[in-house]
UniProtKB/Swiss-Prot annotation:
This is Probable ABC transporter permease protein RT0041. It comes from Rickettsia typhi (strain ATCC VR-144 / Wilmington). The keyword Transport applies. Belongs to the MlaE permease family. It is a multi-pass membrane protein. The chain crosses the membrane at residues 20-40, 49-69, 148-168, 195-215, 237-257.
Amino acid sequence: MLLNIANLVGKHTIKFAQSVGIFALFSFIAISSIIKPPLYLSLIMRQLLFIGFHSLPVVAMTTFFSGAVLALQSYTGFSRFSAENSIATVVVLSLTRELGPVLAGLIVAGRVGASIAAEIATMKVTEQVDALYTLSTDPIKYLVCPRVIAAIITMPCLVLIGDVIGVMGGYLVGIYKLNFNSTAYLTSTFQYLELIDVISGLVKATVFGFIISIISCYSGYYSGKGAKGVGRATTSAVVNSSILILISNYLITELLFKV
């Protein structure tokens, strides 16, 4: 019994180590291929439109209502200690530092990551990736690099827009629901907001963009055969991206805001 358990644990450990090694090599090849010509600008522009512009409505709606709910919940808690004046500060700092980047990252991971993994996995199953080799085209350069570049560029833009919309949601709730003074609320919003708060969110967004794109491309590129392989690749891309987003969010916060 114990021998079987040890054997099972050993197999999974070796399999995990192999997956990590393959992923590290895949990431290294993708990063090194980015600086090599050609750039495939048309593919990059297409991915910029898909990852950035098409994700904007979902990100905007999510951050708007997150900011609104954050204002309501903060008022409920702070009113017990007569600290209602801190609501605007809590909303803007929470959104710029944490909620904005994390929510946008998870949304893009679910929407874009699944699509990227499914698309590349389908190309793998239908042997379109092999066809690129016959045309003397590097599939990683052609399929992976444009998506990685586009994700790194668009994620900070999505987060920045989402932060503004989220603060606007908190502002509207504060003014029209909680009856705050407009000038006082805006003053409190920007009083304690520092450049590092915004920069930290953009740094996180850039890292999240790389994580989502590289994991999704990896999941699709090394997918199994048939429809089941495509489904597993899609699920793996979303789950692994979401987990790494949360882990890297903590590590970046620990690095930038040392307590």
